[in-house]
Amino acid sequence: MIWLRNRRCLEPLQGTPKWVPVLGELQKTLQKGEYLPLRPLPMFESNFVQVTHQGGPVFVNHRTNRLAMGVAASLPGLVLPDILLIGQPAEDRDCSGLVLTRMIPLDLVHLCVHDLSAWRLKLRLVSGRQYYLALDAPDNEVGFLFHCWVRLINLLQEPAPTWTPRTTRTAPLDMPLAEAPASTWHLQDQPISRHAVRVAERNFPHKTVAAQRQRKAKALKRSFKSQAVGDSVPLIWSQLEHADVRKKPAEKKSHSDPRPDRTHTQIRLPEKTSITTWTIFSIISSTANQTQSSPKACTSASDEATGQGHVVESPSHCVSADSPDGFFLGSCSSLDPCLWHQDTEDLMDSGGSTLSSAASGLAPYPPAACLSTPYSSIPRGREKAGPMGSHQGPGPPPCQKAPSGLVTSCKAPFLVDQSQKLPAVPASSWKPPPGLAPPQKAPAASAPPRKAPAVPAPSQKAPAVPAPSQKAPAIPAPSRKASAASASPRKASAVPAPPQKTPPPSQKAPSVPTIPQKAVSPTAPKKKSLLLPAPSQKALPTSPTEYQMALSPPASRGKLPGDFDVLPTGIPGRAVLERSQSGGKPEPVVTVRTQETDVVEMTTQAKSPESPFTVTKKESKDILISQTKEVTLEAFRGQGKLEDWAHWAKLEERSPDLPGVRSKELEQRKRWVKAKELAVEGPSQEHSRPFSVEALTLTKLMITANSKEQPSKSALVSLPSWLLATPQASATSMMASVPSRPGQLSLLEGKPVVVREQPESHTWVKEGKRPWGEMKEQPWGEMKEPPWDPKGPPKVPFRSKPTSASLKREGISQAPIPLTASPWEDLRPSPLSETLISKMEATARASQQPKRVSQEPMRMPAQHPLATVGSSSEILLPMLLELETVRNTATKAEEIQEESGVLNLLPSLQHSQHSEWPDAGA
């Protein structure tokens, strides 16, 4: 290890590598003339190799798929890029360069960090396809280039007004560029020279540079033989200064882009120089929380830094590996750790399922003693010490009072790994020993203009470096093995201890803690080289007692002041192993072994996913609500029916939409189907006649009696008792045998016919009686019809009950019963019939009662559909007439018996008539 260190000391004689902005292959391809619409565009590009989500290569045509991906702005004045360009090497071996294969708007692309330790990005298109791209660059350049890509992703995800600089002059967006701007960085070896590369420097309106420094910058520009291509200086500012700039509205001028999310100032016109474009390349190369160097940052040739005797030679920005802090100088506040955590956490691919342990999370605050990850692993002999407050890596910008304790590592990630959960070295609550006086702001013997203690402790009372309350690792554990220079198989690295001249008890600077094996042993089975910070001459105590105090158990963890500052992480290209200039004695070597586990720990903020399940419950009910209403009014019947269908459904479905997320859906459906049916029925045909039932019945009897047709068969028609309950029921109490024929009976069911009855030719006499016995002697014959009286009211003939005294008397005024002729006319009196008639007369004589009969003839009621009796409005319900068919038997005696049976019913009908008449009359 000592031999390797001694060999590296000779390399600075050959030249110091410096970061130089150059044209990338994709930018060169656009300048060949084949893509004329794509004029010189502000672009940032890098070479990538397509891999799988686990890091394995993807083979296309039996070879790895290499490509160049760049982001560019379609207009030179745009602050943010808006298109993504992808080029691939030409398949023809004769053709050199790239072939542009893809040009996709950035609105349709989502770019994120997939794995920090493997330098892998994830490209997801709007169609859903995902591609994993690993950065393809030399080992000494990959860290810085990947850091630029991370900053680009951060800028694309946050609103631009938070970081866009303010300019005094603006130019049109489509102003063509004089030459193609640089699109990438390259670490180039320079000849031995103490001059640094001078590039254009941005002037903020609220910052003025001394006239002497401007003259020096112009002199350096004239003495240069080579000039950087394009605007290669990453201009630097801080978010705290943006607040000051916003307070000066007179100095603000912004240009609105037609796109709503990209409205910023883009181009500035210097007073005496050519057009300097605030390009995408310059924006990406800067960091979010850095500011422009102040006069204290870039000192003159007489100024010294940290008492090392190394001189920052140029006041202008230096783009070199030795001292890139010229444009990475900055200051941080108490808000910077939060901003750093928030910006870096948003870059991670939250949707990726194969995040490694190094990319699973980030510490909310940077560790107490963050080990730097420089981009170059080659230390230099007369190396310039990093100025105080130089920012190293994507961590929070350090305070200007913090020295740079630097460590080298080939491919250690620039972001600190949180998933390893290494216990950081916290600040103990004990007071410093008597020999260690807490310094205020003067740690160095040859004090520079800047006051810088080695590592400020909380409240300036604890010599150890304070650690955050979170489980932030004090040592980054990348997946790739870190090695010093080319000695990768070595398991441990040498860490130079401070020289013997430094008295430990009189140390006036707080100690920089070292990490013992116990602090990192539980996290790695593989032994990898891990480099600890090599502090300056007056920054590290040598006594074992001080080491034990610096590494004391955490007693004050979580009690961090608001103004607490931390050591920054380094950027690749910074030399780390420093040599003591006070003497040439060999430095003792301290060997530290670390272990890290291969266990991949998946840590997520979401809850643990539950086992997926699906439960579905369905319940459905159909209810029929039916309501029927029937109305009957004056022989009109109406029926209404209302039906309602009620459908009640309950659906409960529980299914996992996402891993660990259960969704419960409760759906209730209520459907009402109303079906309304209305049926109105008119009165029956029996009730639709304008005549009363009594009038129609008597009219039917009269028509039947006057009919000339003599049917062969006769039927007995018996009138119901309710028809006899009329004032004239005494006269119509006789039952007559009426022949029943379909043609004649249809009158009751068909259309009503107005029929007038022929009046009788005789007048009624009170209590006129006629014996029933005359019926047997009087032959049946046709009734003579007197002339009709059309104007007179129809009169219904009445018959009185016969008496025994007048059985053989024939009255002239007596009219025969209007019955149709029947075969009874041919019958002769027989002894059997006389006997039956005599019995009938005796029965009639016994039941005979005198009754006064009204002499007024019965008039037909008015023609209206309802039949009313007297003063009562009672509705008469229809009743069917009882039809009895009398068969014509062979013997005449049976017919006589049937006739006598019908006649025997008359006294009972008359008796019921007398009993019902008072009610009907009432």
Curated annotation (Swiss-Prot):
Bias (Polar residues): 292-305
Compositionally biased residues, Pro residues: 431-441, 496-507
Biased composition regions of type Basic and acidic residues, renumbered to the chain: 758-788
InterPro entries found in the cross-reference section: GARIL-like_Rab2B-bd (IPR022168)
Positions of region (Disordered): 244-264, 292-317, 373-404, 424-597, 758-830, 842-869
Skewed-composition ranges (Low complexity): 442-458, 471-495
Pfam families, alphabetized: GARIL_Rab2_bd (PF12480)
Similarity comment: Belongs to the GARIN family.
Name the UniProt record assigns to this protein: Golgi-associated RAB2 interactor protein 5B
Organism name: Homo sapiens
Organism ancestry: Eukaryota, Metazoa, Chordata, Craniata, Vertebrata
Gene encoding the protein: GARIN5B
